[in-house]
Structures are given as C-alpha cells and as structure tokens.
Amino acid sequence: MAALKALVSGCGRLLRGLLAGPAATSWSRLPARGFREVVETQEGKTTIIEGRITATPKESPNPPNPSGQCPICRWNLKHKYNYDDVLLLSQFIRPHGGMLPRKITGLCQEEHRKIEECVKMAHRAGLLPNHRPRLPEGVVPKSKPQLNRYLTRWAPGSVKPIYKKGPRWNRVRMPVGSPLLRDNVCYSRTPWKLYH
C-alpha cells in the first residue's frame, strides 16, 4: 500500500512539473556548470548556507591535431603513454575495472588494443586498486592459494633466481612488457629493453 502511495505521489509531482513548465521546477532545468563557493550568512538565529557560482569555467581547449581519428591521436599521445599513466587509463575503463567498448571510447583499433594491454598491466601491478568488482554484502574473500606456476615437482618457495643465464653472446633473455608498446617514446639515453 505504501509503495502504491509513493508511486502515485511521484507521478503527480512529475505531471505538475510538466504542466507548470521549466520555470517552476528546479529539477527540469539543466544545472549550471561552474565553480561554486560556499557562503554562510547569519540572520538572527538562522544560518543560511548557499553555494554561489563564482566564475564560469573556460571553454575546453582545442586539440593540437583535430584531424586525428581518435582522442589519443587528436591530442598527440600516440606513443607517449604507458601502463603507469593511471589518470589516462581510468577514462577508458568501467568502475569495476573492465574496458569500455570502442563505440563509447571512440578509439581506433590500434590504440584500443594498446590501452587494453596497459589496463591489464596496471591491474597486475596493483595501480588500479579501486577498480575491481564489488563483493556481495557479507562475503569475506578467501585467501588465494599459491599455485605452482612453474610446473615442477619442487615447491614454488624453494625456487631460486637464475643469476647466470649463459654467456653474453648466447644469453637466454626473458620478455618483459608488451610488444604493442615497443614503439613508445623513450626519454632516457638507453633504448627500451624488451628482453631482460
């Protein structure tokens, strides 16, 4: 009964707002964008706290390359980001950590794949701790068992690093990072090392 009453009162409020026009209802107007300042004024025993719009924000800056086909190309960021640029990556992921589709982000195929790889690497490095699926209420996560990823009969705790991987001319190198990011700009004197 209470739900029906709330539904009827909500519909009545909606109809009154539509019939009265946008001037009468505050929710039908678009909110003004701008910086607000909290102002406290006291009149006798009443304190009035209001937010006044102080200054309108400037228009968004024009991209340096407006003819680019995706946002990364338009802002000339094609080979200039990595997995540790979390502010850039967080614009292309959902709140639970998954990638947004290309239709929404507007990225080209190449940049979408690179952003996806960077998001994976950032998750593995623990740089996106707040972007993971929420557990249901009251569920305590179990501790994950340490699996033997080395597929050997010895315990993973007994594994020691191989300090000598062979002579320098015949050394067995280990791939590091992603081959998708090999064209990134290197700001140091030494070139990128994709194999360590």
UniProtKB/Swiss-Prot annotation:
Its main location: mitochondrion. Residues 1-34 form a transit peptide. This is Large ribosomal subunit protein mL66. GO terms for molecular function: small ribosomal subunit rRNA binding; structural constituent of ribosome. Gene3D superfamilies: Ribosomal protein S18. The lineage of its organism: Eukaryota, Metazoa, Chordata, Craniata, Vertebrata. Signal peptide: none annotated. InterPro entries: Ribosomal_bS18, Ribosomal_bS18_sf. There are 3 mitochondrial isoforms of bS18 in mammalia, localizing to 3 distinct sites in the mitoribosome. bS18m (bs18c) binds to the same site as bacterial bS18, mS40 (bS18b) binds to a novel location of the 28S small subunit, and mL66 (bS18a, this protein) binds to the 39S large subunit. Keywords: Mitochondrion, Ribonucleoprotein, Ribosomal protein, Transit peptide. GO terms for biological process: mitochondrial translation; translation. The keyword Nucleotide-binding does not apply. Belongs to the bacterial ribosomal protein bS18 family. Mitochondrion-specific ribosomal protein mL66 subfamily. Component of the mitochondrial large ribosomal subunit (mt-LSU). Mature mammalian 55S mitochondrial ribosomes consist of a small (28S) and a large (39S) subunit. The 28S small subunit contains a 12S ribosomal RNA (12S mt-rRNA) and 30 different proteins. The 39S large subunit contains a 16S rRNA (16S mt-rRNA), a copy of mitochondrial valine transfer RNA (mt-tRNA(Val)), which plays an integral structural role, and 52 different proteins. mL66 forms a zinc-binding site with uL10m. The keyword Transferase does not apply. It holds the Pfam family Ribosomal_S18. It is found in: Mitochondrion. One of its GO terms (cellular component) is mitochondrial small ribosomal subunit. The gene is MRPS18A.
